[in-house]
Amino acid sequence: MAVIVPPIKSQGIKTKLVPWINDVIFRSGIDLVNANWIEPFFGTGVVGINSPLGGRRIVGDSNPHVINFYNSIKSGIVTPQSMREYLQREGELLERAGDAGYEHYRLVKDRFNKEHSPFDFIFLSRAGFNGMMRFNRKGEWNIPFCKKPNRFAPAYITKICNQVKAVETVIRQFDWTFCNRSFIETIREARRGDMIYCDPPYYGRYVDYYNGWTEENERELFEALRDTEAHFVLSTWHHNEFRSNDMIDRYWDSSTSLHKNISIMVVVISKTDTL
């Protein structure tokens, strides 16, 4: 089955890992029909959107803009048609704007930082430099323009709208709850027989306003997963050519401290990835 790619673009998206994650779930012995999907670090949503489980989807994220976007699809505010109309209009303004498009990018960025529109969120996600998502200490979008004033060509708009349609279909198919809250609160929703998927921010790597991560956070996550009665899958990074993840040895290699319902996926960051 083809992986559904969500409209939100971000570095580190787990699209290529979805088949691997789902294979772990298939082999876990979990009740695929009735188990609920619990995801406290939803991010772009690519893993949860492609979950093979048939129960409820209860997901959270510390970034309110991610949650607002998905709730806007759920409520019908964001549709393939409304997104197309928005991107066609803003794309034309971007192409005609001064400073090779930067004037309009700045306008949308300033507007988003005040109004938090889910449409502007996708515009910035797609027109920002190198597919990055970063917020400053005030919680404002903090990524420069990709310097492509013709970014929203007709074929690219269609691609994004098709992604909105695919996500809309999955949201209508299942019972979804999207919440802007702490990872601990989301994990507490899990019950015996459910599946928790965790892809937390990476300790020791770049953080921003919404995805800071400390050793204390790592310890809290470890204890929450240790104590849950649900199954869970954890994906994290192991090392690159510059450093290794100290939290692996400190917490996650201690499998005897956990229980039989765990599947840990250690994702090796390649040497070409930046810190």
Where are these regions (language model features)?
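Long, positively charged, glycine-interspersed low-complexity recognition regions
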Residues: 214-275
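Short His-Asn-centered micro-motif
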Residues: 39-41, 60-61, 179-181, 198-200, ...
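Conserved S-adenosyl-L-methionine
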Residues: 18, 32-92
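A residue-level signal for conserved active-site and pocket-lining positions in enzyme catalytic cores
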Residues: 70, 122, 232
